[in-house]
Amino acid sequence: MIIFSGGTGTPKLLDGLKEILPEEELTVVVNTAEDLWVSGNLISPDLDTVLYLFSDQIDRKRWWGIENDTFGTYERMKELGIEEGLKLGDRDRATHIIRSNIIRDGASLTDSTVKLSSLFGIKANILPMSDDPVSTYIETAEGIMHFQDFWIGKRGEPDVRGVDIRGVSEASISPKVLEAFEKEENILIGPSNPITSIGPIISLPGMRELLKKKKVVAVSPIIGNAPVSGPAGKLMPACGIEVSSMGVAEYYQDFLDVFVFDERDRADEFAFERLGCHASRADTLMTSTEKSKELAEIVVQAF
């Protein structure tokens, strides 16, 4: 199975999937459009979250970073008047240093991810969506800013006028992702932000055409008219997409076969059928590993 993932939502579902399926059977294609260089090192927030999940390092209270990490380097930089913007943990920073050194030596982002997976003892196949640089910028009332500046620096507060995924039309799907598509028929679109997490992956040239040839199941990150987490509630309207499960399904319509949405959502199942996909209700909140496992079982049965 191939799973498309961002840094929130989908990792919780992955937590359930790895409880019911051998990790070797999971290929996770991860968004890289939120990556940025900080203090000379490449930060890949979504990749790091997935790597830390599969290596049992993740801070499960925040669902990002490493559990019990320290912040000595960040605090020392701050004391010296250097503001990094992102509060990076010391052990987390080691991941970034290893990745960046591999890339500086001429290897790809995929190569660095495969190496980190090996160092962490991960059995799942974790891959960046592309080896080419792609960056999401948010057009706001306060100006245009990188997604991390919008979401972390500004806490997602500015009014959003548009979203620009820079470099995506020139980027290529990574060779190892294409290789995985040759072997797998089942694709899961996880419940991550459809605009800034899943959007960059499916916007890569040729990706939607590949998906049309596969069995695609998607899980909604929206309940009612609000996202479970993250800034999708502001980003979707700015892109002309309704903040609802229906809005998400319509965004995926050209390749979607099965759509799983929350049991508390009042959306009409038959409305999804009219889009050409089968609809299924489930508890999508994933408030515990057991809940994640229950949703994972429903999703696997949908294929």
Curated annotation (Swiss-Prot):
Keywords: Magnesium, Transferase. It comes from the Archaea. It catalyses: (2S)-lactyl-2-diphospho-5'-guanosine + 7,8-didemethyl-8-hydroxy-5-deazariboflavin = oxidized coenzyme F420-0 + GMP + H(+). InterPro entries: CofD (IPR002882), CofD-like_dom_sf (IPR038136), FbiA/CofD (IPR010115). 7,8-didemethyl-8-hydroxy-5-deazariboflavin binds at D48, K87. Pathway: Cofactor biosynthesis; coenzyme F420 biosynthesis. Its EC number is 2.7.8.28. Disulfide bonds: none annotated. GO terms for biological process: F420-0 metabolic process. One of its GO terms (molecular function) is LPPG:FO 2-phospho-L-lactate transferase activity. Its cofactor is Mg(2+). Belongs to the CofD family. PANTHER family: 2-PHOSPHO-L-LACTATE TRANSFERASE (PTHR43007:SF1). NCBIfam families: F420_cofD. Catalyzes the transfer of the 2-phospholactate moiety from (2S)-lactyl-2-diphospho-5'-guanosine to 7,8-didemethyl-8-hydroxy-5-deazariboflavin (FO) with the formation of oxidized coenzyme F420-0 and GMP. Homodimer. This is 2-phospho-L-lactate transferase. It comes from Methanosarcina mazei (strain ATCC BAA-159 / DSM 3647 / Goe1 / Go1 / JCM 11833 / OCM 88) (Methanosarcina frisia). The lineage of its organism: Archaea, Methanobacteriati, Methanobacteriota, Stenosarchaea group, Methanomicrobia. The gene is cofD.
